[in-house]
């Protein structure tokens, strides 16, 4: 088995329980990201589109720290707390991946780690 390498971008809030990303061989696994600032405070309250933009920015920071780009994302899994937020999420997803979108799954859940969070996204990346 390949060695696991944690990916820890500058500026992202840290959680001692998990790494923002873990590289194993040519794959990078990005932990579920929520819309929080660098101090762990929620952003984009009641605005799924704004939250998704912040999440994609966080994912991009992790991906770029590993030496890849958003074009290298091959799969995302999204968790929404309300299906009515799907259009806002979908708009940002389409803007983030305009040419060759990754495989994508969306799951509606009862809630996320904090009630302010409307969306969470995790990703798998094939490193160049």
Where are these regions (language model features)?
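N-terminal presequence-like segments and the immediate start of the first folded domain
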Residues: 1-57, 61-74, 80-128
């Amino acid at each position: 088995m390949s060695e696991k390498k944690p990916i820890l971008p500058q500026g992202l809030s840290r959680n001692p329980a998990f790494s923002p990303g873990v590289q194993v061989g040519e794959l990078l696994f990005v932990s579920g990201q929520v819309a929080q600032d660098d101090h762990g405070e929620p952003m984009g309250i009641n605005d799924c589109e704004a939250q998704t933009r912040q999440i994609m920015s966080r994912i991009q920071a992790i991906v770029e720290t590993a030496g890849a780009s958003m074009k290298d994302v091959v799969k995302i899994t999204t968790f929404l707390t309300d299906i009515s937020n799907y259009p806002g999420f979908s708009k940002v997803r389409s803007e983030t991946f305009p040419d060759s979108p990754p495989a994508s799954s969306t799951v509606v859940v009862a809630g996320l780690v904090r009630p302010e969070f409307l969306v969470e996204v995790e990703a798998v990346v094939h490193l160049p």
